[in-house]
Amino acid sequence: MIGLFLNLLDTQNEKDKFIKLYDKYKNMLYWISYGKTQSCQDAEECVQETFFYVAKHFEKIGDVNSSQTKGYLATIVTGFSIDVYNKSKKYGRIDIENNNIAENLSYFDNIETVELSSAIESVLSEEEKIYIYLKYVYGYKSAEIAEIYNVTDISVRKKLERA
């Protein structure tokens, strides 16, 4: 499967970097996804979707070992996992209160950011939190977020506006 992803990359350096990224994070992403979907098949599908998306947008990956890259990947796989879970159940939301992305990945470096994060965590829905992280932490455009979650750009902008 990794061969498919490598075909999306242009240079040998990118391919080598992708292999390192894949080897380093595939298990972590699987367990994050499995925690949300409670299904081995769905978790594997979400991990593959995550790496496919990353290969298509590989220019957004910085240092493979950085906490920002780790958080970026975790956010994407979480989004895919929630989407798969909701589609399979067709109702309800995933309770991930005890699985706070910010706490698990430690990508907040100072007190002000931690305070802002806790305010976000207590007020926003899970979908709004993910949109906020992708937009303001990782610099995604609303159109890119819409593409990830198969929703309209207008829907993403409205959610961000309400958040």
Stretches found by the model and what they are:
Residues 82, 143-163:
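DNA-recognition helix of helix-turn-helix
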Residues 6-31, 35, 129:
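A short, charge-rich alpha-helical start-of-domain segment used by transcription regulators
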Residues 75-96:
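Arg/Lys-rich amphipathic alpha helix in sigma70-family domain 2
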Residues 91-121:
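Internal acidic/polar
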Residues 10, 51-67, 88:
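Sigma70-family region 2
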Residues 31, 45-52, 56, 67-79:
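Structural recognition of an alpha-helix C-terminal capping motif at a helix-to-coil junction
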Residues 122-144, 148:
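Short amphipathic alpha helix immediately N-terminal
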